Amino acid sequence: MQKRAISSRFSEKAVSYEKYALVQKKMADHLSQMVTEITNENDVRSILEIGCGTGGLTRVIRSYFSAAHYEAVEIAQGMLEQAKNNLEQHGLICSFSQADAEEWVWEQQAKSKDLIVSGACFQWFARPAHTLRGLARILKPGAPLVFSTFGPDTFWELHDSFTNAHAILGEKGVRHGLEFLSARDWHEQLEQAGFTDIEISRKYERLTYPGVRDFLHAVKAVGASVSMEQGSGLGRRKLLAEMIRYYEQTYKRETGIPVTYEVIYVRAVSSRAVTFFK
């Protein structure tokens, strides 16, 4: 997926993001709790956040580690501006950089960070294994990486409905949206990147919307619909209509249609004896 398209779409939706990013807010709350449980604020002098979005997680972590230098990287300029305003309103200081983190990490000083955090960002990586090596490289030996991301069961009702819609229309099915890595995939890639003491947990979050179009509107409002946009014209409209019909006929209850998120939480420690090459 083109990084330019991702950056553009998230920038466009920066204002509406916080209203609709309900699961992402829950992820930020849990992630901040994980961070404060495993770290001593007096031992953390330099923090890096990957993909800060509008600054929800940034604000909480920055407040807790008030004496540390805090740097946040975000690919979407619109999101970055929202994050800056967010922190300024709370009197918090943070160094912000607009960049593609997958390239940016390799330009930073090795063994310079006491903590790296990231909420709901890693699923967008084009080269996760390569980027994890870069993150391990800039962490001090024994320093933690703590992040959350989405697992493959996310939106399973939607994917099932698309699969059946393709079949009903006599079409070959294609994936609509990102291919999420599993908890096992992340564990393997973290090990290969030189991380140790890896702890991974999964949690399912379920939201309910009045109808499928309301759900799709919410996805679009947080900028994530760029991962689902395939095809155009009459064929796409027919597919979308059939998908919605199947979804609501199969899954709708009195309260509305369910939408499932598989959330993966990860804690890992940078190895003390690994040499990193780009």
From Swiss-Prot:
InterPro entries: BioC, Malonyl-ACP_OMT, SAM-dependent_MTases_sf
Known pathway: Cofactor biosynthesis; biotin biosynthesis
Superkingdom of source: Bacteria
One of the GO BP terms on file: methylation
Key word Lipid biosynthesis present: no
Keyword Ribonucleoprotein (UniProt): no
Keywords (A to Z) from UniProt: Biotin biosynthesis, Methyltransferase, S-adenosyl-L-methionine, Transferase
Cited function: Converts the free carboxyl group of a malonyl-thioester to its methyl ester by transfer of a methyl group from S-adenosyl-L-methionine (SAM). It allows to synthesize pimeloyl-ACP via the fatty acid synthetic pathway.
HAMAP family the UniProt entry points to: BioC
Family, per entry: Belongs to the methyltransferase superfamily.
Annotated protein name in UniProt: Malonyl-[acyl-carrier protein] O-methyltransferase
Organism of origin: Brevibacillus brevis (strain 47 / JCM 6285 / NBRC 100599)
Upper classification of the organism: Bacteria, Bacillati, Bacillota, Bacilli, Bacillales
